Amino acid sequence: MSDQNIIEGCIRHNRKAQQMLWKQYSGYLLGVCMRYATDRPEAEDMLQEAFLRIFFNLGEYSGTGSFKGWLRKVTVNTAITYYHKNLRHKHHTDIDDYVNAETGSSGFEEDFYSAEDLYRVLNELSPGYRMVFNLYTTEGYKHQEIAEMLGIDVNTSKSQYSRARAILRKKLDDLAKLKGVYT
């Protein structure tokens, strides 16, 4: 079944079309949610909310641009809304609790870190830093757009991005030392 047929079926509230949309895109969209969530259950909650929005707003998809891109945008906006609703309940753990070595100021080898390492380190950022970092680096938004989406000043977006990068660099250096690789 084509995307257009699935869209038309979902607009008519056809359960089979809704299931096909879920089956075809839930894995991809869960990956998007994982970048903004602190753990998998939270990402799954975001995904559920995103699909509710998708189903309720599917009639607004104009057909211009990629359908997958529209789904991604709805999902990212859902993650932002989820972040705002749950901001006071967020906590993060810190790799510094597990690392006693002093940090050098060198870079790192990308191939040295597993996807799990990178995911864990990203999730150790505060929710605000992680949100700005992901919107800027992964989604490609400009700081002005991020500021408008999150209701913050442009300079706040820039400084949070800069601080997130510095924190990530330090945490990755610490992780390398923990693994016994001195750069």
Language-model regions: role of each:
Residues 9, 90-91, 148-149, 165-183:
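C-terminal edge and immediately downstream basic/flexible tail or linker adjoining helix-turn-helix-like DNA-binding
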